[in-house]
Amino acid sequence: MPQALLDAHSVSIGDGAIALHGETGIPLRSLGTGSSRLLVAGLQRAAAGSAPIALVDEVEYGLEPHRLMRFLDSLGAKEVAAPPLQVFLTTHSPVALRELSGGQLFVVRPTGGHHVVKPAGTSNEVQSTLRADPEAFLAKSAIVCEGASEVGFARGLDQAWVQAGQRSFLALGGSYVNAGGGSPDNSFARGAALLNLGYRVLVFIDADKPSAPGVAEAFVAAGGQVLTWRHGLTLEDEMFRHLPDASLDSLLAKAEE
């Protein structure tokens, strides 16, 4: 019985027709952007002995958050003691920043016609901000809030201003940092860490507990700003003193939900 087969002598196959295939039979050149980047990261790590330096621009490009984390792991982001590669990468992704330590992060600033590279450092203030609020390192300005209540209050004001036709604080390159409550010194320490890296910083705290002597003054002298209430009062005190009864009833009803 005759069969329809290719004539090997009449078919021209060039170099471009030969490609590596994966386990599922898909040509590797047909992989998506994210899969291709993961493959390249693995190859780069395997060749680290002869090519120990890697350059990655916009590391988050084409990668979902979970794959971005895997990509950074492949490049040795968690192997701080003995990294397999020396990697220079740029990013605008808070997911990528959260996976790094402060010792791996450098902030680049244009200054007087040239650029200054500042190491973020490994202080507790830098590391805790990286884990909880990495967006702060991608912003121009940061409001360091004493706790979650202050963050919510600031966000609410921002939304009200947007509804009134003003530009959003976030659209202007701003971010919020939650200092986690406690002493106001915590907020000043977080703020000072960002201030030293060239960010514009405002600390938003209650006025019921004083900071350590000289802490607030040193922060302001370094270029920081402080927003607080009248002496001895907190956010909750001011709200219950000045909001109308209807608004207070709404707040209490929300708290009971």
Please identify what each model-predicted range represents:
Residues 76-83, 94-202, 207-211, 224:
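RecA-like P-loop NTPase motor core
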Residues 206-257:
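Activity-critical C-terminal alpha-helical subdomain
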Residues 7-9, 13:
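Non-catalytic substrate-recognition/targeting regions of SAM-dependent transferases
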Residues 14-136:
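Switch/communication elements of ASCE P-loop NTPase nucleotide-binding domains
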Residues 1-5:
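Coupling/switch/interface segments within P-loop NTPase motor domains and analogous charged loops
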Residues 11, 113-115, 182-186, 230-238:
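A short acidic, often aromatic-flanked loop/helix-cap motif at beta-alpha or helix-coil junctions
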Residues 70, 189-193, 214-218:
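A short acidic, amphipathic alpha-helical/loop segment
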Residues 66, 70, 91, 148, ...:
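Charged, alpha-helix-enriched surfaces in structured cytosolic catalytic cores
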